[in-house]
C-alpha cells in the first residue's frame, strides 16, 4: 500500500478556559477582606505549523482527533489559573485547510514555519474579584471558562513544484524526471506505474534550479474520475509551468496530436485556470522509428489550430533514454519560469474571514427565537449561547447577572413581541426557566 496520502478529514478542539473562582479574603486582623477569587487560565489553541520535512498527510490517517488542554481554574488569594499550552500540529507545505461543514477555505499553508490558529482556545472565566463594586463589595459572581473552538476539517495537500509533467501513461514522464534530477520514481513498461506524485530538484548547466513533479498519467475522462481520475490533478495547481510530455513514436497506436488535445481538454475541464499556465510540449522518444515523421505531422496539425499572429507553444524534441535534447529543454524551462508569476489558488474572497470564522464579527441579530412543539420558547444564537455557558448556574448572583445580560440584549422585549406570557417556559440548550413579565 502506498505511503502517500494527500487528503484527510480530522477534528480539532481547542481547550476550554478555566472557571473563575468565588473566594473571600479571611485573615486575622483583616476585617471585611472582600472578594479574593482569581480568573481562570485561557484554554490552549490548536495551531497548524508548516514543516518542510513532511511530504504527505500520512500522519493523519490514524490520528484524526486533536484536542488542546483546558486552562486551570482560578484560585484564592486572587491568583489566576495557568493558561494551557497551545497544541502544535505539523503539516506539510502546500496543505489547504477547509471547513468540512461549509467547504470554505480557511487557510493555505505554503511557507516553511508558517503558523495559523485553526481553533482558538476559550478565555478564562473571571473570578469574583473582578465584579466588586461600591454597591456590591462582596459579589458571589464568577464566570465559567469559555468553551474552545471545535471544527471538522478537510485537509488537502497540493505539492509545491515549479514544473509539472503531464501526459498519458507510459509516455516517459518518470524516465524524464529520473534523468534530469536525483529523484528515483518507479519506472515500468505498463500503465500507471506512477501512482503517486514524485518530486525532484533540477539544476541546469547555467546554474538555475527548480522543482519538478512527475504526476500519474492522465487518460481521457480523468476529470470525471476515469483511471486515477482527479486524485492527483490537484497537484498541478501549484505549478507555474507545465511540461506536456507526448510519446512521439506512437508506440501504443495513438495519434500524438490527439493525445495532446485530449490531455488539454482534461486539464481545462478539471480547472479552467490550469490552462492559464504556459506549456512546453516535450516530444519524447525521438530515438524511436517514425518519431520524426510523427513530429512533422504533429506540428502541421498544431499550426492549423492557431491564428497566424498567435505564438505557437514551444516544442522540444528529446529522448529521455538516450539523454538527447535535455539541456535545451531545461534551459528553456528555467527561462520561462523566470518570467512567470505564481498563480494564486485562492482569492481573498475565497478565504474565510478570520473575524467571522472565530465569531468576532458583528452581526445584525445576536439571538433567534422559535416556538417549540411543546409551546416552549427556544432561544439560540452564538453570542447568547456563549454567555450562557460562561454563567455559573449554581450561583444566584451569576444567574441574576445573566438575566440582566439577556435584558440588555433585548431578549425580554423580543419575547413579549412574539407573544410570550408570564410563566411561559423559555429554553436555552437544556436549561429551562420561566418568563417573568
Swiss-Prot record:
Residues 161-338 form the OBG-type G domain. Mg(2+) binds at residues 174, 194. Its EC number is 3.6.5.-. InterPro entries: G_OBG, GTP-bd, GTP-bd_Obg/CgtA, GTP-bd_prot_GTP1/OBG_C_sf, GTP1-OBG_CS, GTP1_OBG_dom, GTP1_OBG_dom_sf, OBG_GTPase. It is found in: Cytoplasm. Residues 359-437 form the OCT domain. Residues 2-160 form the Obg domain. GO terms for biological process: ribosome biogenesis. Monomer. An essential GTPase which binds GTP, GDP and possibly (p)ppGpp with moderate affinity, with high nucleotide exchange rates and a fairly low GTP hydrolysis rate. Plays a role in control of the cell cycle, stress response, ribosome biogenesis and in those bacteria that undergo differentiation, in morphogenesis control. This is GTPase Obg. It comes from Streptococcus pyogenes serotype M49 (strain NZ131).
Amino acid at each position: 500500500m502506498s505511503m502517500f496520502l494527500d487528503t484527510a478529514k480530522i477534528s480539532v478542539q481547542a481547550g476550554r478556559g478555566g472557571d473563575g473562582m468565588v473566594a473571600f479574603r479571611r485573615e486575622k486582623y483583616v476585617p471585611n477582606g472582600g472578594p479574593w477569587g482569581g480568573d481562570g487560565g485561557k484554554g490552549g489553541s490548536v495551531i497548524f505549523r508548516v514543516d518542510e520535512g513532511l511530504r504527505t498527510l500520512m500522519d493523519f490517517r490514524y490520528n484524526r482527533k486533536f484536542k488542546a488542554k483546558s486552562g486551570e481554574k482560578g484560585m484564592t488569594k486572587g491568583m489566576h489559573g495557568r493558561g494551557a499550552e497551545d497544541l502544535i500540529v505539523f503539516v506539510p507545505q502546500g496543505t489547504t485547510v477547509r471547513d468540512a461543514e461549509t467547504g470554505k477555505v480557511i487557510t493555505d499553508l505554503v511557507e516553511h514555519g508558517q503558523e495559523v490558529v485553526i481553533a482558538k482556545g476559550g478565555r478564562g472565566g473571571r473570578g469574583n474579584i473582578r465584579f466588586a463594586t461600591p454597591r456590591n463589595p462582596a459579589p458571589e459572581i464568577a464566570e465559567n471558562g469559555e468553551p474552545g473552538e471545535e471544527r471538522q476539517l478537510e485537509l488537502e495537500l497540493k505539492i509545491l513544484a515549479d514544473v509539472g509533467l503531464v501526459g498519458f501513461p507510459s509516455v516517459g514522464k518518470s524516465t524524464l524526471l529520473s534523468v534530469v534530477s536525483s529523484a528515483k520514481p518507479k519506472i515500468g513498461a505498463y500503465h500507471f506505474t506512477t501512482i503517486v506524485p514524485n518530486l525532484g530538484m533540477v539544476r541546469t548547466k547555467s546554474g538555475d534550479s527548480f522543482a519538478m513533479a512527475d504526476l500519474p498519467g492522465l487518460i481521457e475522462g480523468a476529470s470525471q474520475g476515469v483511471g486515477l481520475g482527479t486524485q492527483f490533478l490537484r497537484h498541478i495547481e501549484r505549478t507555474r509551468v507545465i511540461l506536456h510530455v507526448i510519446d512521439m513514436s506512437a508506440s501504443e497506436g495513438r495519434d500524438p496530436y490527439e493525445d495532446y488535445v485530449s490531455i488539454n481538454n482534461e486539464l481545462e475541464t478539471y480547472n479552467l485556470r490550469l490552462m492559464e499556465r504556459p506549456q512546453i510540449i516535450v516530444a519524447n522518444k525521438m530515438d524511436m522509428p517514425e518519431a520524426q515523421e510523427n513530429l512533422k505531422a504533429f506540428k502541421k496539425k498544431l499550426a492549423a489550430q492557431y491564428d497566424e499572429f498567435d505564438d505557437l507553444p514551444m516544442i522540444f524534441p528529446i529522448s529521455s533514454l538516450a539523454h538527447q535534447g535535455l539541456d535545451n529543454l531545461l534551459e528553456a524551462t528555467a527561462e520561462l519560469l523566470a518570467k512567470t508569476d505564481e498563480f494564486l489558488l485562492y482569492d481573498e474572497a475565497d478565504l474565510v474571514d478570520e473575524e467571522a470564522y472565530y465569531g468576532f464579527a458583528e452581526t445584525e441579530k445576536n439571538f433567534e427565537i422559535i416556538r417549540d412543539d411543546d409551546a416552549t420558547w427556544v432561544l439560540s444564537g452564538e453570542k447568547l449561547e456563549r454567555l450562557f455557558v460562561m454563567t455559573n448556574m449554581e450561583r444566584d448572583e451569576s444567574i441574576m447577572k445573566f438575566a440582566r445580560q439577556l435584558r440588555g440584549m433585548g431578549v425580554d422585549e423580543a419575547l413579549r413581541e412574539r407573544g410570550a406570557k408570564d410563566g411561559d417556559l423559555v429554553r436555552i440548550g437544556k436549561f429551562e426557566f420561566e418568563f417573568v413579565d
